[in-house]
Swiss-Prot record:
Lineage: Archaea, Methanobacteriati, Methanobacteriota, Methanomada group, Methanobacteria
Biological source species: Methanothermobacter thermautotrophicus (strain ATCC 29096 / DSM 1053 / JCM 10044 / NBRC 100330 / Delta H)
Subunit annotation: MCR is a hexamer of two alpha, two beta, and two gamma chains, forming a dimer of heterotrimers.
Pfam families found in the cross-reference section: MCR_beta, MCR_beta_N
Family in the record: Belongs to the methyl-coenzyme M reductase beta subunit family.
Protein name from the UniProt record: Methyl-coenzyme M reductase II subunit beta
Task of the protein: Component of the methyl-coenzyme M reductase (MCR) I that catalyzes the reductive cleavage of methyl-coenzyme M (CoM-S-CH3 or 2-(methylthio)ethanesulfonate) using coenzyme B (CoB or 7-mercaptoheptanoylthreonine phosphate) as reductant which results in the production of methane and the mixed heterodisulfide of CoB and CoM (CoM-S-S-CoB). This is the final step in methanogenesis.
Requisite cofactors: coenzyme F430
Cofactor: how bound: Binds 2 coenzyme F430 non-covalently per MCR complex. Coenzyme F430 is a yellow nickel porphinoid. Methyl-coenzyme-M reductase is activated when the enzyme-bound coenzyme F430 is reduced to the Ni(I) oxidation state.
Length: 443
């Protein structure tokens, strides 16, 4: 028996029905097989830039930006021999012939996707085993393939793994993981939140609803890891994932379509009308001025509706400007207007609006250190909302028309070209719906 009575219809990014009458728990990270596979692959996958390694060795550009070591140039036809290198890497990484190690060449051998076996993940204390094992395997594979001597072997290591272990991260490396090193996390359990918005956008190939869905899946799954989505709060996070992330009951699509020529204010008007119609909220009292105070029939469901409206308002507002910079102020003032309109708390009970205040300052106010695309849920500025703000940032970067200094192409080219090859990363909405369909009758 399901723990919750909620049942939802799941719609695609095109507004078409995918699966109906789905128990809410069928989209839970603890139950949905697609989300389980996605999280597993996030942890065990590594993108290796063979073309980058070849170029670094050829120019002796080792260890990061502006680092050149004249006289240490090494010319190796790495991309030309990508298949042989990939085969060697597979033999080094796998633990048995029939395990789930996966090696995939991408872009004619310029990149490799390496997925280490779950047996290695199972005996490791954290997820960095994937990067460390893959890095070591690639180094050895190149040395063996080209018979590199002991004097140039360290150059190969640096071209692959960067300055590590001089640094705690892989500065200057030609391998990338979606999850950053645990030592750089803002708090315990923040690993899945440590994926910048631009990476999410690149993986989903700038499809707005799929990008916000992937962001929501990662953010809300992290809530189960941090203990936020336990007990009384679990349903709130599941509803948020379903409605804001997965377009449950087509609410997100309907709000955007209805306000295609509207504003943040018209989205709020549509949302309140829909919430009243669906009996999520009701009038609690009416003042002499005619102003109506509302109360929710269901606090968790109201938060899910409000969060969906927030994402819709972001899509409408940023979509009109084709400039992502407005996402912070949209998140802020959507909540401000919504609270004045209804007398109800905003998204995430105030945390989304609070996050947006700092986000506005650090993304484009007098500080302006970085554009919206480089932020993530592990950032000291944007960590405070419990999974409801970052999907808006991902959506905004999908709609940006090239206004950003930190563009998706600049920050996330390798990540996008590699991870977008995995279908449930690229199109999470339809694949999570398939996973829900598999298990809905078993709950």
């Amino acid at each position: 028996m399901p723990m919750y009575e909620d049942r939802i219809d799941l719609y695609g990014a095109d507004g078409k029905l995918l699966e109906e009458d789905v128990p809410l728990e069928a989209v839970s990270p603890l139950k949905n097989p697609t989300i389980a596979n996605l999280v597993s692959d996030v942890k065990r996958s590594v993108a290796v830039n063979l073309a980058g390694i070849e170029g670094s060795l050829k120019k002796a550009a080792l260890g990061g930006k502006s680092n050149f070591i004249p006289g240490r140039e090494v010319e190796l036809p790495i991309v030309e021999n990508a298949e042989a290198i990939a085969e060697k890497v597979k033999r080094l990484v796998q633990t048995s012939e029939d395990d789930d190690t996966n090696i995939r060449l991408i872009n004619n051998g310029q990149q490799i996707l390496v997925q280490v076996p779950t047996t290695r993940m199972g005996v490791a204390a954290d997820y960095t085993v994937s990067a460390l094992v893959t890095g070591a395997a690639v180094v050895q594979a190149i040395i063996d393939e080209f018979d590199v001597d002991m004097f140039d072997a360290n150059a190969v290591k640096t071209a692959v793994m960067g300055r590590y272990p001089q640094t705690v991260d892989f500065t200057g490396a030609n391998l990338s993981t979606l999850l950053g090193p645990p030592v750089l996390l803002e708090g315990l359990g923040y690993g899945l939140r440590n994926i910048m918005a631009n990476h999410v956008v690149a993986i989903t190939r700038k499809n707005t609803l799929n990008a916000s869905a992937l962001s929501s899946i990662l953010e809300q799954t992290a809530m189960f890891e941090t203990g936020d989505a336990v007990g009384a709060f679990e349903r709130m996070h599941l509803l948020g994932l379903a409605y804001q992330g997965l377009n449950a009951n087509n609410l997100l699509f309907d709000l955007v379509k209805e306000n295609s020529k509207g504003t943040v204010g018209t989205v709020i008007a549509s949302l309140v009308e829909r919430a009243i119609e669906d009996r999520v909220i009701k009038v609690a009292s009416e003042m002499k001025s005619g102003y109506k105070m509302y109360e929710p029939a269901d606090w968790a469901l109201w938060n899910a509706y409000a969060a969906t409206g927030l994402l819709a308002a972001t899509i409408v507002n940023v979509g009109a400007a084709r400039a992502a910079q407005g996402v912070a102020s949209t998140v802020l003032y959507y909540n401000d207007i919504l609270e004045y309109e209804t007398g109800l708390p905003g998204v995430d009970f105030g945390r989304a609006m609070g996050t947006a205040v700092g986000f506005s300052f650090f993304s484009h106010s007098i500080y302006g250190g970085g554009g919206p695309g480089i932020f993530h849920g592990n950032h000291v500025v944007t960590r405070h909302s419990k999974g409801f703000a970052l999907p808006c940032v991902a959506a905004a970067m999908c709609l940006d028309a090239g206004t950003q200094m930190f563009s998706v192409e600049k920050t996330s080219g390798l990540i996008g070209s590699v991870y977008s090859e995995i279908d449930y990363f690229r199109e999470p909405i339809v694949n999570v719906a398939k996973g829900a369909a598999e298990i809905k009758d078993q709950l």
